[in-house]
Amino acid sequence: MSELEKAMVALIDVFHQYSGREGDKHKLKKSELKELINNELSHFLEEIKEQEVVDKVMETLDEDGDGECDFQEFMAFVSMVTTACHEFFEHE
C-alpha cells in the first residue's frame, strides 16, 4: 500500500474511532469532535477547552445543519487544517 493510501485508511479509521460513541456511527457529535481534535490534532491545534470554540467549529463544519459532522464534513475540516499547516511550514 502506498503512503497516500495508508494516510487515507488512517483518516477513515480515526473518524470511526470517535464517531457513533453517542449516536449515529457515521457522524460525530460535538463531544466526539472535541475529543478527536484534542487527542488527534494536539500538535497542530491547541487543546479546545471552551464549549463555545467547539460550537463554532461545528457550526462551520456542519454544512447540512443536522448538528453533527459526517465524514465529508470531517474531510473538509482535515483539508482546511492540512492546508493551513502546509502554508505555515512552507514559509519557515
Swiss-Prot record:
Superkingdom of the organism of origin: Eukaryota
Function: Small zinc- and- and calcium-binding protein that is highly expressed in astrocytes and constitutes one of the most abundant soluble proteins in brain. Weakly binds calcium but binds zinc very tightly-distinct binding sites with different affinities exist for both ions on each monomer. Physiological concentrations of potassium ion antagonize the binding of both divalent cations, especially affecting high-affinity calcium-binding sites. Acts as a neurotrophic factor that promotes astrocytosis and axonal proliferation.
Protein name as annotated: Protein S100-B
Entry's Gene Ontology cellular component terms: ciliary basal body; cytoplasm; cytosol; extracellular region; extracellular space; neuronal cell body; nucleoplasm; nucleus
Binding-site positions, Ca(2+) 2: D62, D64, D66, E68, E73
Pfam families: EF-hand_1 (PF00036), S_100 (PF01023)
The keyword Membrane is annotated on this UniProt entry: no
Entry's induction text: Up-regulated in periinfarct ventricular myocardium.
SUPFAM superfamilies referenced in this protein's UniProt entry, alphabetically: EF-hand
Gene it is expressed from: S100b
Tissue: Although predominant among the water-soluble brain proteins, S100 is also found in a variety of other tissues.
Source organism of the structure: Rattus norvegicus (Rat)
